[in-house]
C-alpha cells in the first residue's frame, strides 16, 4: 500500500474475511480476524463494526490503524489484538473505556507504548476486567498502583474530564493528600475514649473514688501540698511504681466494665510491679508505653492484655529493688484533649545515670545501650503478641496513637528536662556533700553542667540520625541490586530474542539464495528447450514424411506441457519469495524496535546509577562529619571533668 493512503474498513470486507453469507446477520459473528497484508493495510474502521454487537474476539494486527473511532460498538468484545499498528496517543486508547468486557488487549509495537510512560497503568485503570495486556498478565500490584496513580477524581466517565486530565496533568499533591487523610483516620479518638480518660483523670486514677467524694477545699489543699513537694523533694520508687501502674490499672478497670477482664489473674498482675531502678526503670517506662498502646485497642483484645500483663509480672519478679529518688518531672503528664504524655526511655535513663554518678560520658552511653538492649529483649514477647493480635483482626484500630506524636513534643520539653536533670544532680551532690544548696547559686558550675547535658542530648540525636542514614544506605543498595538484576534479566531476554531473529534471518537468506538458484536453472532450461523447439520446427518444415512429423509434434506437445507446468511452479516460487521478503522486512523493524527499547533502558540505568552514586557520596560525607563530631565530644567531656575535679 502506498504511504499516506487512507483505507477504511467496510462491511463487504468484513463479510468476505469472515466467510459470512450476504443474507446472514452480522450480529451472529463471534470472531473476526483481518490482519494486514503487504498490499493492503487498514487505517480507519469507519462504521463497519456497528452491527457486530455480539463479537467476542477481534484481530486487526499488522495494519496501519491511526484511530480507533468506531470500535465503541463492540460492547461484548473480550479479546482485542492491535499488534503492530499506528496508535500514537492515549486519547485513542481511551475509546476502549466503553468496552467493559475486555480481558485481553495487545498494543505491542504501537507508538503509544513507547511515547506514553503511564500507558500500562492507564489501560489497567480504565478496563476493570483486564487480565492480560501486551502478552503479559496483569498483576494485582499493577491494579493498586493504577488506583494510586489515577485517583477517583480523575474520572474516566466523560471525554471532557479525560481531556482535562491529559492537558492539565495530575496534581502533584494527590498522593500526599491520600496519605494525610489516612493518617488523620489513625489519630481520631472516639468520644467514649475521651469520656473514659477524663473520668479516670478526675478520679485520681482510682475508679473506686468518684470525683464527687472530695470537697473543693480538700482538693485545693492537696494540690498545694503536691506542688510544694514537687518543687524541692524527690519521689520514692514506690511512687514511680504507682505512676507506672496507673496505665495498667486504667486498662484493667476498662475491661471490668465490659467483659470483666482476665479472670485468671489477680489485680496485681495488671500493675508494672516493683521497679528495679538500677536497670529496670527504662524497661518500666517502655512497658508503660507499650501497655498504654495495648489498652487503647478495642475491648476484643482481652487475650493480648492478659499476655502482656503476665509478661510484665514475670519481668518485674526477676529484678531486684534498689531504691533511688526520682524527681516529679518523670511522672506522666496530662496533655490537652485527654491524652497523656509518658517520659521516654532516654529521659528516665539519663536521670538514673546522673543519679548513679558515672565517671564519664562513655560509661553513660555504654550503660544506656545495654539497658536499651535488655528492654528490647524483655518486651519482644509482648510486642509479638500484640502484632499477632493485630494481624488476626485484619485492620488496625484508628485509635492507636502513632509514635511520631510522642516524639513531636521533644523539642518543647528539652529545656524543662534539662532543668529537671540539673536539679536532681545538684540535690544529689548536696546530699553527698556537707552543705545544702551550695551549688544551686554557682553560675560557673551551672553553665558547665548545662553544657554537659546539652552535649549528651546532641550526641544522642546525632546517633539516631546516623542510624537513619545507615538504613537509607541499606535501602539504596538493595534497590540498586534489584535494578541490576532486572537489567541483567532484560539483557538476557534481549540477547535471546536477537539470537533467535538472527537465526531466522539467516535461514530466510539461505532459502532466498536456493530459490534464486532454482530460478536461474529453470530459466536456462527454458531457453534451451526453446532453442530445441525452434530447431525441431525447422526440421519439421524440411521433413519429407508425415509420420516423422507427427511423432515430432507429439513429442513437442509433451515438452510444452512440461514447460508450462514448470512455469506455474516458478510463479509459485516467486510469490513465496515475495512473502518471505515481507516477513524479513517485518523482522528487521521488530529488531530495530527492540534495539531502541534496550537503549532507553540503558539510559535509565545510567541515570539511576549516577543518582545513586551522588546520594552515596552525600551520605559518606555526612558520615565523615558525624565521625569528626563524635571524636570531639569525648575530648571535651574529659577536659571539663578535669576542671571540675580541680
From Swiss-Prot:
Family matches, as SUPFAM superfamilies: L domain-like
User: What InterPro entries does the entry give?
Assistant: CEP72-like, Leu-rich_rpt, Leu-rich_rpt_typical-subtyp, LRR_dom_sf, U2A'_phosphoprotein32A_C
Compositional bias of kind Low complexity:
307-319
Question: Which compartments is it annotated to reside in?
Answer: Cytoplasm, Cytoskeleton, Microtubule organizing center, Centrosome; Cytoplasm, Cytoskeleton, Microtubule organizing center, Centrosome, Centriolar satellite
GO CC annotation terms, alphabetical? centriolar satellite; centrosome; ciliary basal body; cytosol
In which ranges do the LRR repeats occur? 28-49, 54-75, 76-97
Keywords attached to this entry: Coiled coil, Cytoplasm, Cytoskeleton, Leucine-rich repeat, Phosphoprotein, Repeat
Q: Does the keyword Cytoplasm apply?
A: yes
Concerning Gene3D superfamilies, the annotation shows: Ribonuclease Inhibitor (3.80.10.10)
Main location as per UniProt: cytoplasm
**From start to end residue, where is composition biased (Basic and acidic residues)?**
383-392
Gene Ontology BP annotations: centriole replication; gamma-tubulin complex localization; regulation of protein localization to centrosome; spindle organization
Does the record's keyword annotation contain Transport? no
UniProt-annotated stretches for the region Disordered: 300-342, 357-399
Signal peptide boundaries: none
Summarize the subunit comment: Interacts with KIZ, PCM1 and CDK5RAP2.
Described by its record, this protein's role is as follows: Involved in the recruitment of key centrosomal proteins to the centrosome. Provides centrosomal microtubule-nucleation activity on the gamma-tubulin ring complexes (gamma-TuRCs) and has critical roles in forming a focused bipolar spindle, which is needed for proper tension generation between sister chromatids. Required for localization of KIZ, AKAP9 and gamma-tubulin ring complexes (gamma-TuRCs). Involved in centriole duplication. Required for CDK5RAP22, CEP152, WDR62 and CEP63 centrosomal localization and promotes the centrosomal localization of CDK2.
Name of this chain's protein: Centrosomal protein of 72 kDa
Amino acid at each position: 500500500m502506498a504511504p499516506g493512503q487512507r483505507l477504511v474498513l467496510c462491511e463487504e470486507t468484513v463479510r468476505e474475511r469472515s466467510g459470512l453469507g450476504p443474507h446472514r446477520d452480522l450480529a451472529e459473528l463471534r470472531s473476526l480476524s483481518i490482519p494486514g497484508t503487504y498490499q493492503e493495510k487498514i487505517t480507519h474502521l469507519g462504521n463497519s463494526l456497528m452491527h457486530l454487537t455480539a463479537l467476542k474476539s477481534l484481530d486487526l494486527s499488522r495494519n496501519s490503524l491511526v484511530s480507533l473511532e468506531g470500535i465503541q460498538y463492540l460492547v461484548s468484545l473480550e479479546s482485542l489484538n492491535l499488534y503492530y499498528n499506528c496508535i500514537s496517543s492515549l486519547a485513542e486508547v481511551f475509546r476502549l473505556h466503553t468496552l467493559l468486557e475486555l480481558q485481553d488487549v495487545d498494543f505491542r509495537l504501537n507508538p503509544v507504548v513507547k511515547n506514553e510512560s503511564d500507558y500500562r497503568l492507564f489501560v489497567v485503570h480504565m478496563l476493570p476486567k483486564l487480565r492480560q495486556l501486551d502478552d503479559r498478565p496483569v498483576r494485582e500490584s499493577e491494579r493498586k498502583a493504577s488506583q494510586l496513580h489515577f485517583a477517583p477524581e480523575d474520572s474516566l466517565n466523560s471525554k471532557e474530564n479525560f481531556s482535562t486530565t491529559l492537558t492539565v496533568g495530575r496534581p502533584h499533591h494527590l498522593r500526599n493528600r491520600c496519605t494525610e487523610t489516612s493518617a488523620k483516620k489513625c489519630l481520631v479518638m472516639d468520644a467514649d475514649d475521651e469520656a473514659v480518660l477524663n473520668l479516670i483523670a478526675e478520679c485520681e486514677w482510682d475508679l473506686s473514688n468518684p470525683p464527687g467524694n472530695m470537697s473543693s477545699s480538700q482538693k485545693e489543699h492537696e494540690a498545694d501540698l503536691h506542688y510544694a513537694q514537687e518543687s524541692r523533694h524527690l519521689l520514692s520508687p514506690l511512687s514511680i511504681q504507682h505512676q507506672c501502674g496507673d496505665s495498667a490499672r486504667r486498662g484493667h478497670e476498662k475491661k471490668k466494665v465490659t467483659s470483666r477482664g482476665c479472670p485468671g489473674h489477680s489485680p496485681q498482675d495488671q500493675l508494672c510491679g516493683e521497679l528495679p531502678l538500677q536497670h529496670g526503670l527504662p524497661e518500666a517506662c517502655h512497658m508503660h508505653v507499650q501497655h498504654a498502646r495495648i489498652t487503647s485497642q478495642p475491648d476484643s483484645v482481652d487475650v493480648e492484655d492478659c499476655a502482656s500483663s503476665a509478661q510484665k509480672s514475670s519481668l518485674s519478679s526477676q529484678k531486684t529493688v534498689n531504691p533511688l529518688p526520682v524527681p516529679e518531672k518523670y511522672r506522666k503528664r496530662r496533655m490537652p484533649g485527654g491524652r497523656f504524655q509518658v517520659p521516654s526511655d532516654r529521659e528516665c535513663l539519663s536521670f538514673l545515670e546522673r543519679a548513679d554518678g558515672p565517671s564519664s560520658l562513655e560509661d553513660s552511653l555504654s550503660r544506656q545501650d545495654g539497658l536499651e538492649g535488655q528492654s528490647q529483649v524483655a518486651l519482644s514477647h509482648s510486642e509479638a503478641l500484640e502484632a499477632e493480635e493485630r494481624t488476626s483482626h485484619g485492620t488496625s484500630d484508628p485509635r492507636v496513637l502513632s509514635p511520631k506524636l510522642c516524639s513531636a513534643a521533644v523539642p518543647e520539653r528539652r529545656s524543662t528536662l534539662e532543668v529537671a536533670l540539673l536539679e536532681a544532680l545538684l540535690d544529689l551532690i548536696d546530699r553527698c556533700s556537707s552543705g545544702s544548696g551550695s551549688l544551686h547559686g554557682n553560675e560557673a558550675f551551672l553553665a558547665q553542667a548545662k553544657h554537659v547535658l546539652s552535649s549528651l542530648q546532641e550526641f544522642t540525636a546525632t546517633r539516631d540520625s546516623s542510624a537513619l542514614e545507615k538504613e537509607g544506605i541499606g535501602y539504596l543498595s538493595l534497590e540498586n541490586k534489584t535494578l541490576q538484576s532486572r537489567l541483567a534479566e532484560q539483557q538476557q531476554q534481549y540477547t535471546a530474542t536477537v539470537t533467535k531473529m538472527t537465526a531466522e534471518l539467516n535461514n530466510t537468506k539461505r532459502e532466498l539464495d536456493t530459490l534464486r538458484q532454482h530460478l536461474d536453472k529453470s530459466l536456462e532450461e527454458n531457453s534451451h528447450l526453446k532453442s530445441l523447439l525452434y530447431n525441431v520446427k525447422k526440421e519439421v518444415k524440411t521433413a519429407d514424411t508425415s509420420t516423422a512429423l507427427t511423432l515430432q509434434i507429439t513429442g513437442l506437445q509433451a515438452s510444452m506441457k512440461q514447460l508450462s507446468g514448470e512455469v506455474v511452479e516458478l510463479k509459485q516460487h516467486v510469490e513465496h519469495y515475495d512473502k518471505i521478503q515481507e516477513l524479513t522486512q517485518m523482522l528487521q523493524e521488530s529488531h530495530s524496535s527492540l534495539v531502541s527499547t534496550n537503549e532507553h533502558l540503558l539510559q535509565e540505568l545510567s541515570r539511576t546509577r549516577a543518582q545513586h552514586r551522588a546520594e552515596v557520596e552525600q551520605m559518606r560525607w555526612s558520615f565523615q562529619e558525624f565521625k569528626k563530631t563524635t571524636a570531639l565530644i569525648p575530648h571535651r567531656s574529659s577536659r571539663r571533668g578535669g576542671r571540675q575535679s580541680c
